[in-house]
Amino acid sequence: MLRTVLLGKIHRATVTGACLEYVGSISVDSRLLAAAGILPHEQVHVVNLNNGARLVTYAIEASEGSGAVVLNGAAARLAAAGDQVIVLAYGQGTAVELEHHQPQVVYVDAQNRIVSVHRSVEHAG
């Protein structure tokens, strides 16, 4: 049986724009995608911490070092510049394949610069 687990996460990124007329997706600074292990065109879930919206789309690369996090197409209706979002990518594997799996979690500052990268999820509490 395959199980679905978190592969990579960009935590509390700041939305830098929304482009309703674009065909779709979320554009993310390629440096952030690479750090989280998220591939271009990979399915991602986006959670908006400001309004609670959740959506599924795919990631595309924005210019490296730009700090860009832009929701495109219909998703642009679910976020505004300045909102904080979490970008999550999931994968599947067997229990054996996942026995030692740890997700890549990227923490960023208000300008979407990488603060730290961890191979586990820290729990609040």
Curated annotation (Swiss-Prot):
Any GO MF annotation of the entry: aspartate 1-decarboxylase activity
Cofactor (UniProt): pyruvate
Annotated keywords: Autocatalytic cleavage, Cytoplasm, Decarboxylase, Lyase, Pantothenate biosynthesis, Pyruvate, Schiff base, Zymogen
Domain of life: Bacteria
Cellular location(s): Cytoplasm
Binding site for substrate: T57, G73, A74, A75
Protein name, entry field: Aspartate 1-decarboxylase 2
